[in-house]
């Protein structure tokens, strides 16, 4: 049902830019005018989700449609981890990317969405290479760090990106005979570990998110190897 290469190609088009969290159509227009490569449609930014507590779900379809109607750049929206019906709703709305997001309250603590069964590309978060490769194995077309969304604190995003890069470098320089053991240790698909060994990078774009609060933070992540950054509530909330 899906062609992963087409999905990855769509994700590649977002490289070298900023993806901005927006909570209404006006913010979406401002983000587009300011040069954002995409917007993330949200009812509440992560900082407010943290502050308010309670259950965080997919955004109201009405809000997503309003945002889609005023911008020409890609529109992303978040679904809860494992909530494939929220993802089906988002796909039917015509969003350009779905972020299966840990910022929302998980619907399934054991299983992620089977992303290959959708035509729309998925974004997924990771804290290390094993997690990244498992999500790619499920059909993710774009990987990002999880960081600490809504805090304005960049430290976790930096740690995670450095860890992914370190793990990639280790696999790239490993002997071919070690790859099966590495795959088992990472709990990752063997073919994806082999890809990393041969190419020295993930098979999908590698972005950064979670606590990116200033232009300097965004530049830091890019210079550490992130191919784009998700700039969220941190940029408004950071003191």
From Swiss-Prot:
UniProt key word Lyase: yes
Organism, as annotated: Francisella tularensis
Enzyme class: lyase
One Pfam family this sequence matches: SOR_SNZ
NCBIfam families: PRK04180.1 (NF003215)
Reaction equations catalysed: aldehydo-D-ribose 5-phosphate + D-glyceraldehyde 3-phosphate + L-glutamine = pyridoxal 5'-phosphate + L-glutamate + phosphate + 3 H2O + H(+)
Pathway: Cofactor biosynthesis; pyridoxal 5'-phosphate biosynthesis
Chain residues that bind D-glyceraldehyde 3-phosphate: 162
Subunit structure: In the presence of PdxT, forms a dodecamer of heterodimers.
Protein name: Pyridoxal 5'-phosphate synthase subunit PdxS
Residues that hold D-ribose 5-phosphate according to the record: 21, 150, 211, 232-233
Function: Catalyzes the formation of pyridoxal 5'-phosphate from ribose 5-phosphate (RBP), glyceraldehyde 3-phosphate (G3P) and ammonia. The ammonia is provided by the PdxT subunit. Can also use ribulose 5-phosphate and dihydroxyacetone phosphate as substrates, resulting from enzyme-catalyzed isomerization of RBP and G3P, respectively.
Catalytic residues identified in the record: 78 (schiff-base intermediate with d-ribose 5-phosphate)
Any one GO molecular-function label of the UniProt entry: pyridoxal 5'-phosphate synthase (glutamine hydrolysing) activity
Organism lineage string: Bacteria, Pseudomonadati, Pseudomonadota, Gammaproteobacteria, Thiotrichales
């Amino acid at each position: 049902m899906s062609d992963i290469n087409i999905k990855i190609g769509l994700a590649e088009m977002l490289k070298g830019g900023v993806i901005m969290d927006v909570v209404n159509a006006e913010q979406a227009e401002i983000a587009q005018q300011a040069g954002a490569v995409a917007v993330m449609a949200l009812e509440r930014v992560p900082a407010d989700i943290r502050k308010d507590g309670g259950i965080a779900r997919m955004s109201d379809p009405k809000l997503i449609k309003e945002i889609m109607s005023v911008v020409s750049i890609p529109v992303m929206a978040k679904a809860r981890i494992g909530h494939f019906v929220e993802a089906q709703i988002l796909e039917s709305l015509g969003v350009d990317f779905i972020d299966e997001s840990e910022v929302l309250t998980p619907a399934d603590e054991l299983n992620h969405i089977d992303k290959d069964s959708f035509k729309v590309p998925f974004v997924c978060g990771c804290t290390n290479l094993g997690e990244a490769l498992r999500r790619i194995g499920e059909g993710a077309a774009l990987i990002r760090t999880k960081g600490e969304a809504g805090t304005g604190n960049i430290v976790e995003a930096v740690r995670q990106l450095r860890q992914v890069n370190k793990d990639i470098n280790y696999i790239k320089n490993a002997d071919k005979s070690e790859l099966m053991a590495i795959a088992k240790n990472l709990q990752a698909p063997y073919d994806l570990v082999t890809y990393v060994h041969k190419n020295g990078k993930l098979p999908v774009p590698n972005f950064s998110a979670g606590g990116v609060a200033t232009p300097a933070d965004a530049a830091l992540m890019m210079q550490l190897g992130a191919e784009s950054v998700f700039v969220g509530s941190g940029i408004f909330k950071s003191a």
